[in-house]
A protein has these predicted regions:
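Repetitive helical segments and hydrophobic/amphipathic motifs
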Residues: 11-12
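Positively charged n-region of N-terminal signal peptides that target proteins for export
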Residues: 1-4
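Cyclophilin-like peptidyl-prolyl cis-trans isomerases
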Residues: 7-8, 17-207
């Protein structure tokens, strides 16, 4: 399977105690290009700009098992629960492949809880509508037996079966009140220190 590189050219605006966090772009890397260990540099291919129709014809879950979020604070590598939450992983990968996540930021940062991104509204400097954007559709929850703990990659939602594009990475040791309410579709395998750096950034009242 291949690894997908999310290239959050993470732009951090640290002004007056406020933070506009992560920007993302995505590029696929074939299995033959994967590093032997997480310590090696993952090669980056040219930015992908495929049309949605082309991507929709491809089963991306069978091709990509991981993704790398590249930020200006370092890289975050996540591994997917592709066999347990296939629809969620497929949705994430298709949005990534079509460039939907390009320029999106981690718009919500809550210390000792989580960092959240994936909202297209966060691409600009208008804070007022961050957190309410999406891809224009919603899809059902896809729960599994994995608990939401530190490092978990999960879908943000506004209630049952309202998944779209927003996701979050858990920083708390455990979050039992979220289990069975948010689809857990992966986990951080490298770069949790980067997640912690993002979590430590100053925020504003929107967080």
């Amino acid at each position: 399977m291949k690894k997908l590189i999310l290239i959050p050219a993470l732009i951090l605006l640290m002004t007056a105690g406020c933070t506009k966090t992560v920007k993302e772009e995505i590029t696929p890397v074939a299995d033959s290009q994967l590093p032997a260990s997480s310590e090696q540099q993952v090669p980056v291919v040219d930015k992908v700009s495929e049309q949605s129709k082309q991507v929709s014809e491809i089963n991306l879950v069978s091709q990509y098992s991981q993704a790398v979020l590249k930020t200006n604070l370092g890289n975050i590598t996540v591994k997917f629960y592709g066999s347990e939450s296939p629809k969620t992983v497929e949705n994430f990968l298709k949005l990534a492949q079509t460039g939907f996540y390009d320029g999106v930021r981690f718009h919500r940062v809550m210390k000792d809880f989580m960092i959240q991104g994936g909202d297209p509204n966060s691409k600009d400097d208008d804070w007022s509508n961050d957190g309410i954007g999406g891809p224009g559709y919603k899809f059902e929850d896809e729960f599994n037996n994995h608990k939401l703990v530190a490092g978990s990659l999960a879908m943000a939602n506004a209630g049952p079966n309202t998944n779209g594009s927003q996701f979050f990475i858990v920083t708390a040791k455990e979050t039992p009140w979220l289990d069975g309410k948010h689809t857990n579709f992966g986990y951080v395998v490298d770069g949790m220190d980067v997640v912690k750096k993002i979590e430590a950034l100053p925020t504003n009242q929107n967080d």
